[in-house]
Amino acid sequence: MKLDIGGEETFEVPIETLWSALNDPAVLKKCIPGCKDMIPEGGDRFKLILNLKVASVGGSFEGEISLANQQPPAQCKVAVSGSGTLGQGSGSATFSLEQQPAATLMRYSGEGEIGGLVAGVGQRILKGVAKHLIKQFFTSLRREVTAAPPAQS
């Protein structure tokens, strides 16, 4: 089952602060919903261990996240793949950052492919779950970057 995501978020921090947070495994571990561990595997690749609940079914997932096509501090592509008790999935998203007068605008777009038991809950429910998880990520990221000291230029 295919899922498409996209949107934009505004963060009231300088672009460098947001870029640093998006490239900090400790911050990402706190922000990725259900993330239990994020283990460096070399370069810009990390092993992920997640516990997620989809509809009324919960399970654990193990996978990989990698960063590519980085153009600091403006753009990055993220690729994710994994499998677990509920099925398997993979996807990628591109994030672009643009400095605004008093904030940073983040635009994102991506797509994912989900299979296995989790795909059986239906596309409408999965889209709702995906939107909820994305909202959780951005809420946590906003909390992390606004609590952080300003980035040094």
What are these regions (language model features)?
Residues G7-E9, C35-K36, E62-N69, G91-Q99:
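Hydrophobic/aromatic beta-strand elements that line small-molecule binding cavities or substrate pockets
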Residues M1-K47, N51-K53, A147-S153:
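Hydrophobic ligand-binding cavity/cleft-lining segments
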Residues V118-S153:
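A conserved amphipathic terminal alpha-helix motif
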Residues L18, L22, L28, L67, ...:
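Hydrophobic pocket/interface hotspot
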Residues F11, L52-S56, Q71, G84-L86, ...:
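A generic beta-sheet turn/junction motif
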Residues G82-G128:
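Beta-strand/loop substructures that line and gate deep hydrophobic ligand-binding cavities in soluble
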Residues I39-S81, Q136:
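Glycine-rich portal/gate segments that line the openings of hydrophobic small-molecule binding cavities
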Residues K2-E8, R45-K47, S60-E62, Q75, ...:
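Intrinsic-disorder/low-complexity, polar/charged segments enriched in Ser/Thr/Lys/Arg/Asp/Glu/Gln
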